[in-house]
Amino acid sequence: MSTHDILHRLSETLASRRHADPEKSYTAKLFSEGPDSILKKIGEECAELIMAAKDGKRLNIVWESTDVIYHVLVLLAFYGLSIEDVSQEMRRREGISGIDEKASRGTK
């Protein structure tokens, strides 16, 4: 099973939970609470990932990275996006200098 396969399946599962019972699904609970709740969880999980990385504990880094990725996928699903949208953008950027790619977006 490829990394893309598991992320694609998870992305589909998350999208299917959008209207599930928040009492029975953590993902549905996040959806029902809205983007602020999802963003808060992403922030918390990123902080935990940073701490795991600072401690140099490889297994904890994997666990916390998994939590960050999960919550980012929830955010994408909340906005009707999926890992495929991110994959397409990564393919577009492949082989382009990060400096050049960022400059091509112009100012915000």
From Swiss-Prot:
<comment type="similarity">
    <text>Belongs to the PRA-PH family.</text>
</comment>
<keyword id="KW-0028">Amino-acid biosynthesis</keyword>
<dbReference type="Pfam" id="PF01503">
    <property type="entry name" value="PRA-PH"/>
</dbReference>
<keyword id="KW-0963">Cytoplasm</keyword>
<dbReference type="GO" id="GO:0000105">
    <property type="term" value="P:L-histidine biosynthetic process"/>
</dbReference>
<protein>
    <recommendedName>
        <fullName>Phosphoribosyl-ATP pyrophosphatase</fullName>
        <ecNumber>3.6.1.31</ecNumber>
    </recommendedName>
</protein>
<keyword id="KW-0368">Histidine biosynthesis</keyword>
<keyword id="KW-0547">Nucleotide-binding</keyword>
<comment type="pathway">
    <text>Amino-acid biosynthesis; L-histidine biosynthesis; L-histidine from 5-phospho-alpha-D-ribose 1-diphosphate: step 2/9.</text>
</comment>
<dbReference type="InterPro" id="IPR008179">
    <property type="entry name" value="HisE"/>
</dbReference>
<dbReference type="GO" id="GO:0004636">
    <property type="term" value="F:phosphoribosyl-ATP diphosphatase activity"/>
</dbReference>
<keyword id="KW-0378">Hydrolase</keyword>
<keyword id="KW-0067">ATP-binding</keyword>
<dbReference type="GO" id="GO:0005524">
    <property type="term" value="F:ATP binding"/>
</dbReference>
<dbReference type="GO" id="GO:0005737">
    <property type="term" value="C:cytoplasm"/>
</dbReference>
<dbReference type="InterPro" id="IPR021130">
    <property type="entry name" value="PRib-ATP_PPHydrolase-like"/>
</dbReference>
